[in-house]
Amino acid sequence: MSEVLNVEEIFGSKVFTLGKMRERLPKSIYKEVKKIIDHGGELSLATADVVAKAMKDWAIENGATHYTHWFQPLTGITAEKHDAFVTHPDESGKMIMEFSGKELIKGEPDASSFPSGGLRATFEARGYTAWDITSPAFLKEDATGVILCIPTAFCSYKGEALDKKTPLLRSMEAVSTQALRIVRLFGNTEATKVVASVGPEQEYFLVDRDKYLKREDLIFAGRTLFGAPAPKGQELEDHYFGTIRERIGSFMKDLNIELWKLGVTAKTQHNEVAPAQHELAPIYETANIAVDHNQLVMETMKKVAGRHGMTCLLHEKPFAGVNGSGKHNNWSLGTDNGVNLLDPGDTPNENIQFLLVLACILKAVDTHADLLSQSASDVGNDHRLGANEAPPAIISVFLGEQLEDVVKQLVETGDATHSIQGGKLLTGVSTLPDLDKDATDRNRTSPFAFTGNKFEFRMVGSADSIASPNTTLNAIVAEAFCEAADILEKADDFDIAVHDLIKKYLTEHQRIIFNGNGYSEEWVEEAAKRGLPNIKSMVEASETLTTEKSIKLFEKFGIFTEAELRSREEILYETYSKTINIEALTMVDMAKKQYIPAVMEYTKTLADTVLAVKSAGADATVQTTVLKSISEKLAEAQAAETSLEDKLAETAGIENPKKLAFFYKDVVHTAMDDLRTPVDELEMMVDKKVWPVPTYGDLIFEV
């Protein structure tokens, strides 16, 4: 029998929680820290010194030797620089371990080597990290030792945001301020803030590490750039929610333990649709903590997979022909006195506050559909969105039958008199209970779906930080709340004004509501008639960051300056170009050094066989036909490889980042597809024993 695991005991054991602060800090200091966490404010240096000492003592007791300001630059992953707690030895030669309040609050990493989109020159190296007091410090432990990690924001010497956390925190304050205006209108005077909560469902693939190391494309690009489909894929629908293999289950068990220690509320785990694909979902938490924890989830997945002889693939589309991976971003708003603004109750037609919030969100999503799409755009996501496995690239909102009916009543008559109820689900079996049925079904094809008391934004890519989608969501909803509050706060008769405004918003923005099949061609045509944007690539999406509408939105709430937005647009173009360039160079390398030589060797064997059969006086028609077919495909692959190299050479003459990104999308990417096609066809024709890399069957079924 395996050892009994005490989850309550290990949960948060590597986190400097409020509970540990309460135990270790003087009462007055703890109260000051708690007040700042709850309501904002600046920590005095004297208080920071006390907190730093308590934090250091706790970390050292748990084996830590170093600390780091843990931040999230515009690379999309985390960054850290480790500093030891050591100082100069005293007169007796004894080492003194210190950590000051100043070191806790502020760090100075080199800002010149991170993406800045022109905000910083190479010689302008100074950058600052600032402690995010609302996200608890934690310990990371691996073969390098134990490190105290302090979540921080990252900005330039001039104050520009150089990370993903700073805009997120700004957006959280913006939506809280504007949402408070809304709840005040309905008589809630107790709430002091409105909190954006997030729960990201993380999808991923696991492959055997030995096989992974034999694929250059997986190593350099994170996805397979070549690969014929295996005879069996996901068509039997037998992997989704299927029995978890013991090797995978062992990985999941260790992953859960590591995450629980880090305070991550890992709750749900299961097999996903594609072979070798799985999912982990946590419980919801405050948006910035959810962002931090999701970064820890992705990092921990990779580490734990390595211990089990596997590699975790987080790319949105590691294998062609089977489902890719996403990260469903469940988002909601709640007051600090326990009111979920997205809870419609049993009779949403009577819940005027909910209807106003819903109308504002529909207005926000419709007005800024392009910007919301951009927030989830990514090089890898281009391969996933719009296929019959993921939400379409067209933003629409699924409300379900109950809310759609309420909206219809309000638009047509200005009044909603009833709400469809769920009723009972009769199982028809005497030993099974009859079940309370929800008032609406779910729609897995919708990119932005209402799911009972939250919205699920399903376009986000599996490898992406969830900071940008939530920054954008918070910002666009803050704007809609602000405009509504501006009108209603001046109204002579609030009841009449709020009903009129709800009807106005729903009427003007009902085009964004779609409860049907988002995968269908009919929806693509219908969306075009409705005037909804259909942004199909990261390059096209990047342009939306710097439209007049977007700049006005972000500047109004102090989330981004125009300079910060333009820098991010440039970084996105550069990231796209660099990513496709790496993929293209990898394809060239694999084609020239692996595939073409292997096939040439095989054709030599076939040619020898043809000669041997003919010399024996036998019929060599079959051998000759096979040799001819393979030789023709080999020539096609060789020509495509040469063409791809030629296209890559042309990029050297394109200096404009935007034009270069479009060239990679329209020209280089097409040349990559042209090379993949004959190589994949050759894989189906050549003896498996001589094929130079593990196949799809090897990778996704042998793990």
How does the language model describe each region?
Residues 1-7, 701-703:
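Basic/polar N-terminal segments that are highly enriched at the extreme N-terminus
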Residues 47, 71, 100, 282, ...:
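Active-site proximal loops enriched in glycine and acidic residues that flank catalytic Cys/His/Asp
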Residues 64, 68-70, 291-307, 333-334, ...:
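Hydrophobic/aromatic-rich, well-ordered segments within soluble, folded domains that form packed cores
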Residues 502, 507-703:
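C-terminal amphipathic alpha-helical interaction region
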Residues 125-314, 323-326, 333-570:
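Glycine-rich, acidic/polar active-site loops that bind/position phosphate-bearing ligands
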Residues 218-219, 294, 316-317, 343-347, ...:
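Composition- and surface-driven signal marking solvent-exposed, interaction-prone regions
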Residues 76-92, 109-112, 117, 215, ...:
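Short linear, low-complexity motifs centered on an aromatic residue
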Residues 10-125:
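Active-site core of metal-dependent hydrolases
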